[in-house]
Design a protein with these regions (language model features):
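A short, glycine/small-residue-rich beta-strand->loop->alpha-helix junction that serves as a flexible
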Residues: 7-17, 174
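Donor-binding and catalytic core of enzymes assembling or modifying cell-surface/extracellular glycoconjugates
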Residues: 12, 190-277, 282
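Leloir-type glycosyltransferase catalytic cores
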Residues: 272-298
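Extreme N-terminal starter segment of soluble prokaryotic enzymes
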Residues: 1-5
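Secretory-pathway luminal glycosyltransferase catalytic domains
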Residues: 43-193, 298
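Short amphipathic alpha-helix
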Residues: 18-25
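A short beta-strand-loop structural module common to alpha/beta enzyme folds
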Residues: 31-42
């Protein structure tokens, strides 16, 4: 039986983009789509899509080999590739390649597919799938109590705005945004959202303790990085509005906010000069990277 395989890898936000692409591929190609999760066998990342009610099956080693043509001798694979019959897609990060969704001989897809146009046609389904369920009650008592404490603060705010500041592995390679981006975004937001209440999310507690945004804020910085992807995304999408970082993690939190009048602000420059990852109705604010680098500076 014919089928296609999409690789799942990276952190939670990346996995969500890959799954959204896979579901869209299934719809457009009218072909069964399987997920290759073998990257987590050697990566320090975890398969987190199981937090959601996903319904695409996992590919077996044999199915992955067939999709990659690895069941054929290497010389045969190379010959087919030279003849234009390669069945493995080129790596896609930010580029929008609509032809990938059309019927083709491609059977294995790898990349990040970070453009909402890949799944615009099934947006309601994707949002329904990625609406996180209530926190699990067992083995997370302390974290659940902290979550509900923070959630009560957000829900009590009349005009809640989350601000995500991505540092972590971005620091030192020139990918973290200068804080002037958040300040300009807050100036824009303050003119449109009266009496806004800010909730700052960051994985760097020391950084937020010395942070000056020009506006008062509640520090929601997590103290448990292992649980950050689950609990903090729940909290961010509970806000009315959002200021995201150049991070797929806060991108999805903003995308899943249910407020029909939400204002979402994102950096004009994402990574490597790409801009199309932001939804068309979101506001783009000029930004620069804090550490200058020819490779990473936009």
């Amino acid at each position: 039986m014919a089928f296609k395989v999409v690789q799942i890898c990276g952190g939670l936000g990346n996995q969500m983009f890959q799954y959204a692409f896979a579901k869209s591929l299934q719809k457009h190609s009218n072909t069964p789509v399987l997920l290759d999760t073998t990257s987590f066998d050697w990566s320090n990342r975890k398969m987190q899509l199981e937090l959601f009610p996903i319904d695409l099956p996992y590919a077996s080693e044999k199915e992955i080999a067939i999709a990659k043509m690895q069941h054929l001798p290497k010389l045969v694979r190379e010959a087919l590739k030279c003849m234009g019959f390669d069945r493995v897609s080129q790596e896609i990060v930010f580029e929008y390649e609509p032809k990938l969704l059309k019927p083709s001989r491609l059977t294995y897809f790898y990349g990040y597919f970070q453009d909402p146009r890949y799944f615009d046609a099934i947006s309601p389904l994707i949002k329904q799938t990625f609406t996180l369920p209530p926190p699990p009650p067992e083995n997370h008592k302390k974290k659940e109590e902290e979550y509900h404490r923070k959630l009560s603060l957000i829900l009590a705010a009349k005009n809640s705005v989350f601000v995500h500041i991505r540092r972590g592995d971005y620091v030192g390679i020139g990918c973290q945004l200068g804080i002037d981006y958040q300040k300009k975004a807050l100036e824009y937001m303050a003119k449109r959202v009266p009496n806004m209440e800010l909730f700052v999310f960051c994985e760097d507690l020391e950084f937020t303790q010395n942070l000056d945004l020009g506006h008062p804020f509640m520090d929601m910085t997590t103290r448990d990085k292992e649980e950050e992807g689950y609990w903090d995304m729940l909290l961010m999408q509970s806000c009315q509005h959002g200021i995201i970082a150049n991070s797929t993690y806060s991108w999805w939190a903003a995308y899943l906010i249910k407020n029909p009048e939400k204002i979402i602000i994102g950096p004009k420059h994402w990574l490597f000069g790409y801009e199309n990852i932001l939804c068309k109705e979101w506001v783009k604010i000029e930004s620069h990277f804090e550490v200058k680098s020819e490779k990473y500076n936009a």
